[in-house]
Amino acid sequence: MPEEQPQQQQQPVREQPSNPDDVPWKKVWTINEMRDSAKDWNLSSDAGLLNYMQDFANKLIYKTKELEFQVDELVKDSKSIHVKVHNTFDQFLMLSNTQFIENRVYEDNSELNNEQNEQTDKPQQQEITEEILIPKFSKAILIGLEALEKANFVNAALEISEQSNSNNNNNDYQQQMNGSIAASSAEGGLVEGGEQAGTDAQPSANTEKKKEKLDHYLRYPLPHIIGSQQFHQDDFCGLFIEDSDSDSSDEEDEEDVDAEDGSDESSSESSSDDDDEKDEQQQSTLFLTDEQPKQQNFFFQDEDATSENNANKKVSESLFEDEDDIFGDKPVASKKSSNSYTSSLSDILGGDDEDDLFGGSKKKQQQQEDADGDEPTKKKDPFADELNNTLSSKNKGGDDDLFGGSSSTTTTSKPKKKSMFDDDLFGDSEETPAPKSSASRKVTFDDSLFGDDETALPTSKKDSTTTSSQPQQKKTLNDLFTDEDLTPATKKETKKSSSLSFLDGMDEDDLFGTPKPKSTTTSAAPTATTTKPPTPIPDSDASGSESTTGKSSPAPKKPVGGVKLFDFDAAGGDIFSGKKVGTGGKSSPSPAPKTESKASEDDFFSSDKKSTSATKKDAEIFGSEGGLLDVPEKKIKRHDPKKYVDSDVLGIDSISSDKNKPKVQDPFGVGAAGSNDDDSFDIPKANSKKEQETKPTKSTTTDDDLDIPKAPTTATTTTTTKPAVKKSTKSNFFDFEDTDSPLSSNKKSGGDDDLFSFDSSKTTTETKKQPITEEPKKKQDTTTTPSIDPFSGLDIKKPSEASISPASPVSTIESDPLFGDIKKPVAQKPKKTNFFDGDLTKDEPAKSEPTKVEPTKVEPTKAEPTKVEPAKVEPTKVESDKKESNPLGGGDEESVFGDFSIKKNPTTSSSTTATENKPAVKKSTKSNFFDFEDTDSPLSSNKKNDDDIFSSTTKKSTTTTTTTTSSKDFFGDLDTSSGNKKVEEKKSSDFDSFFSGSDDPLGITKPKSKTTTTPPLTSTTANIESDDPLSLGLPTFTNNNNNNNAKPPPPPSPLGEDVPSPLTSNNTKNRTKSIGSMFEAQQQLQQQQQEKNRSESPTSEKAEPTKKTSNISSLQNKLSLNPNMFLPGSKMPKKKKEESENEDDSSTNNDNDSSATDLSDSGRSSPSVTSPTLSGGRPRRNTVSSRNNNDSEESEPVKELTHATASRPKSGGRRPPTRKSGTSAPNRSESPTPTQKSDSESEKVRSSSPITTKPVVSEPTKKTISNTSFFDDIPSEKTSSGKSSPSPTIKSTSEKVTIDPLGDIFASTTTKPTASETKAALSSAPKKSEPETPKETPKETPKEKEQTKEKEQPKETPKTTTTKKSTKAVETKSETDSFFDDIPDIISRPKASVKSAAAKKASSTTKPVISDDIFDDITSTTSKSTTTTTTTTTTKAKSTKAVDNLFDDDTNTTTKATPTKATPSKSKPKAKNVENLFD
């Protein structure tokens, strides 16, 4: 029925919804309805029953699902907690790794703990006693009386059964006990030992003999259970037995033997009672073991169930002999148990006291009970042994008694215990308790309770503090309140009782015995309290008046016991637990309640009172008597102080927050920059970014190390030294270039994002760290803060993005190869460093930056990578990008660039050719062609925009006036007006700034960048043409240059051979020679010059840069100071000057290299080849062809890059365009003719090429690794696709056909100038052309703004616009288009118009059709001249135009700010072309 009713209730609810028509068979019937219709059952009833069953099943399923859901929630919560717990573990482990954590094993000095507990307890107890003791005593007495009433029945039965046996045994035993113990304690001893004495009196000799036989084994308790508290507390794990331990174990063993003997001898006392008691003991032991936490249950159950074994015997003895013993002994037992709970320390003290109450009686009783309690004691012995061991381990002097050992009196009581035990347990001391047991049982509750209560109280006090045996209950009472009485007899008994209570006491006081294990386990410290607890028992046991009087006599001591009593008695066992409360409460109040309940077996009082008062003790002792708890808590803290808590709280919070950062910085920073990078990545990237920005100095070295390991391992060491410089520079440059470029490139330019995202992903931290180092060097060289500031502002925001960007590495296929090759990077980075320093810097800002920071150092490092590159040149064959770029940069970065720059310089004019050849050499020396343009364009597109943008923009602006004239004019103006020195300086500064701020670094940097970067260029270019989406730009660009898109991939290995066939026009021939020489010669030179550069490179390369752009670079340096200030850092100007000198030297070196040998590879040999082919154009073409290992167009980009490297000031802004911008920039700087002065000036203004170049130079390493990433980044700038972002130069290429290889990028830039090519490029890559529009209104509004501003500024002054716009472009780093926007604006500069004629002439000579195509694309963007379209493939003259156009387009694409007034009209049409190309 009850089931039916709830169902009925639920059913009506379902009836309503289920009764649409109130049809009986459609509604869910209730049970009542079914019951009513049972008589008239029909189909409708069946239907209703079915509905009811279905409804019931649905409800059941619903509830089941709800329950399942709840279970799932619980599982989820539990799993989350599990995770949290393990996270906490991990935090601790991490803390332990970072912070020393000491794990100590503390030995609790029971005596000290007891003394402290007593000291603390006495004043507190005195304060508390008057107010609290009276109610507690009254409660304890009431509970005790109830327990006594229950015990009286059991005791009466036990007395009746045992009187016959126990009387004789007790008499004999009393005599023995009297001999050993004082007469006053004789009754107590009889009470305690009565039963045991009865059993042991006669067979004591047998028991002793048996014990002696068994002593060897009994002496050795089983070791502690592994993992148990005792196991941890005991240094010897219970294996080593000290004297006290052995004694206690012997006593326990004797008790066990006595239990065995007792089982045999129990018939003498009363076999029936013993059997009953055995059953009771087993039950009580079950209660103890199972219900130890339940104190009241133990007391009542044990007492009810018993008189249980020991409780019946001991309690009966104590109750019968001395009801004081009942009160005294039981309270002592309760105290003992409570003490054991309260503390393992209290086990020692309380063990003695309680053992006195229980212990003496227990041991004696247990010996008698051994027959009864053999099995239970044996069962409990393991626990008892462990408890004894723990107590003994605590006392390592180890009193035999568990309690005695820990009690302050244990030391004295130990020998006494031994004598007691020797007499009782071992000797015949058990027999002495026997008379006591008989007497105690005979001494009925009435006498012992009230008559002997006073005596019992003092005895219990004595027992508790002195651990005196129960036999002298008066002493125990005194001991309760005072620890003074240390009667040896009582002590001996107490020790016995303690050991018995633990071992045999487990049987009697399973509550008591097991509590002791708990007490020992629960707290070692509380043992001190155990001594005191016994005293309260007599108090409570004594009638209210007597107990108070008994306590009053020890009143001064009683306050201590009283307080303890009250503390424990708070629950109700106050009298018994009085001192226990004090001591036990202090030691461990919570354990005390448990022990009290167990102790209450012996003391019915204590069992009830303690059960209640034990809980109250916890509350009151802890609450009201805070002192008691305070002491145990303090003791617990001694154990627990666990430096974990403080260290955890401090360590986890502070270490996790503070230490993680500092340690991450210090450990990782100290640990090799690599760890910092790892930390940066491991640490939340936001944190790592911030830290890295702050840390960049540390992380720069680590980034360099990381990047270098990723790239050439050799470079890593040098880069690590360099990072110091890089740090400061990177902060600006890095924020500006690397941080911004990775971030902004990721944000701004899709393609740049790929490059930069690759870098940022890879070296987001690295970019932050390393680029910063690069910037300082660049700053040192250029000392232009303006560029840094605009970018640093952007960079700071972007650094976080940069850290986020690590995901972007996937964005560009090229970048992926870079990072996929990061393991390979050793070869690739050098390659890309050669091909693009910008990409390397971005991909691996650290590496490229290392080169920048200290070119000299970086160059040796790169020189080693260059060696790797020669090896990689073959891999590059496997990977067209890497292989081809290796040949270009592989032979010698210097030579590769030198060749390119030499070609461009010759292109400019015959007179300019000499000067420009030097710049070209300079470029080749630096491998800045790749480093400069590629590194500059990808990296500087955002970060090094000023250098790349400006260098490329200047070139673009050159083309703006007239394609044909602008190329020559562009270079001629820079070279003639400004002098070739400025152009050379600008180029050298570009290289230097690209690689590092100092000339010496340039020397080193150049070899590295050249060796590492040039090979990547060629290989990357070839691969890009065939493989990369960027190749789209090249294919269209290949329309003129690139019939060879298929061929360019093969050319990489035979660059020279394949390229000629790819090239349809003169470019092919020039390229063929240059490319062949490039790859073959460069590979050789890379090996040779890498060695040379390692030894000589610092000086030779330094000299080479100066020669490269000595005249042009001087003008460019002057012009480019402002833009460089904005982009890489203020250090760039220094590099310009240094580079100008170095470039002069390097130009001579390049000339020597190119003329003397093809060591410069195609790049340097190409100048010689180029000059014969064309005054200025062939060398460029050769350089381009050398670049175009895969593509004839690539060779042109190579030229452009070479020139860009030479005139890095120009290409500083162009770095995002990378190859294209680099290519156009080199053409401008190398073709520099009289017109080149103005161009170089405008270029300098547009892009402080030295400044930007330096950042670019440092970047090459990373970009070398990520050739594809460079182009991907640039195309992505121009268009969301990685192709369009290539940056200004790349802009046109990516516009037409997202240039697959780097060469294609340049080719597309070349095509871009040409109207027809622009159209083709638009058709091939319409998406890129539109993105290219970023100049005017590309993807990003900031770019548009920059474009508009730049366009306006170009009209006013090309130079200023260049710097301003370049900074703006840098500021708009977040958008890839900004780089291109800056570049198109640069294209429209009047500079370009001035230089266009000379630059085109130079480019026609230096750069054949391919370079023309590249420049044509650029020209079309800056100043659309349809001539360049045709010139791309038609003739050398046209190729010069194309070269000019390339530079113009590069300039336009490179920097928005660079375009001058002349460009605005042209830049807009070219911007359209750029848009088309990028679309």
From Swiss-Prot:
GO terms for molecular function: phosphatidylinositol phosphate binding; retromer complex binding. Residues 542-552, 802-814, 904-916, 1062-1075, 1108-1123, 1163-1174, 1220-1236, 1307-1317 have a biased composition (Polar residues). The keyword Phosphoprotein applies. The modification Phosphoserine is found at residue 1249. GO terms for biological process: negative regulation of actin filament polymerization; protein localization to endosome; retrograde transport, endosome to Golgi. Keywords: Phosphoprotein. Residues 242-279, 422-431 have a biased composition (Acidic residues). It comes from the Eukaryota. The keyword Kinase does not apply. Residues 1-25, 188-210, 240-564, 576-1383, 1419-1479 are annotated as: Disordered. One of its GO terms (cellular component) is early endosome. The modification Phosphothreonine is found at residue 535. Residues 595-620, 765-781, 839-885, 981-990, 1091-1107, 1327-1358 have a biased composition (Basic and acidic residues). Residues 1-17, 334-349, 465-475, 514-532, 709-723, 951-968, 991-1000, 1010-1021, 1147-1162, 1277-1292, 1419-1445, 1452-1466 have a biased composition (Low complexity). Probable component of the WASH complex. Belongs to the FAM21 family. This is WASH complex subunit 2.
